[in-house]
Amino acid sequence: MAGHSKWHNIQHRKGAQDAKRGKIFTKLIKEIVISAKIGGGRIENNHSLKIIIDKALAVNMRRNTIENAVKRGNGDFDGNNYEKIRYEGYSLGGTAIMVDCLSDNRNRTISDIRHAFLKHGGNLGRDGSVSYLFTKQGFISFDTGNENQIMEIALDEGAQDIITNDDDSIDVITTPEDFFTIKDVLTTSGLEPSHAEVTMEPASRVELNLSDAEKFMKLIDHLEDLDETKKIYHNADISDKVMVRL
């Protein structure tokens, strides 16, 4: 199947965003600590922890920093009771947004999220107001690679779809349950993905013009800057022509 890479387009200016490395590290360390506290420090038994550690390694976090965070999670922790919360809302053009947070103060977090939406022309909705527009799935992306080899291995292991994009990148789509198996088989076969995660994929996307895209990206940037934000999902489609002008 051919297409246009959603990852290479809409994971909005990640090269620029990743310049905020210190903030990214702080968020990832908190996620590692909490995941280890909730599910234990062994990645064989804690898939959530494995995903977060893979993200940390992908941004060049040192292994001893990761190990120390896991140890903190297995120990006394810091006394705070964090909970996972998902907020849902709409932005310009009817774009749907979901924000996954780790919060130790629900009232503060919802106030911060609501303020971000209102400031940038969006509206915070109720639980379930946009989540029905998304499906949970595994996503394994390769910048380039042997398409036939990737396709053969992935399909043999039960991948749902293989997408060859206009920029020659390749995306493997899996069920959440098959994600780790397929990713591990591809990796052990010498096929190292540029990005891999279990994500929420929208059923369809809303294309934004330059004006709406500028305002939309300001909302996304604001949400990403909040300490409590863990992950953002949305169904906006910003063309390459518009993206280069942001």
Swiss-Prot record:
Alphabetic keyword roster: Cytoplasm, DNA-binding, Transcription, Transcription regulation
InterPro entries reported in the protein's UniProt record: Integrase-like_N, TACO1_YebC-like_2nd/3rd_dom, TACO1_YebC_N, Transcrip_reg_TACO1-like, Transcrip_reg_TACO1-like_dom3, YebC-like
Disulfide bonds: none
A family per Pfam: TACO1_YebC_N
CC terms in the record's Gene Ontology section: cytosol
Biological processes annotated in GO: regulation of DNA-templated transcription
GO MF, one annotated term: DNA binding
The keyword Transcription is assigned to this record: yes
Statement: the UniProt record of this protein carries the keyword Electron transport: no
Localization per Swiss-Prot or TrEMBL: Cytoplasm
Chief location bin: cytoplasm
Highest taxon listed in the record's lineage: Bacteria
Family: Belongs to the TACO1 family.
Name the record gives this protein: Probable transcriptional regulatory protein Rmag_0394
Species this chain originates from: Ruthia magnifica subsp. Calyptogena magnifica
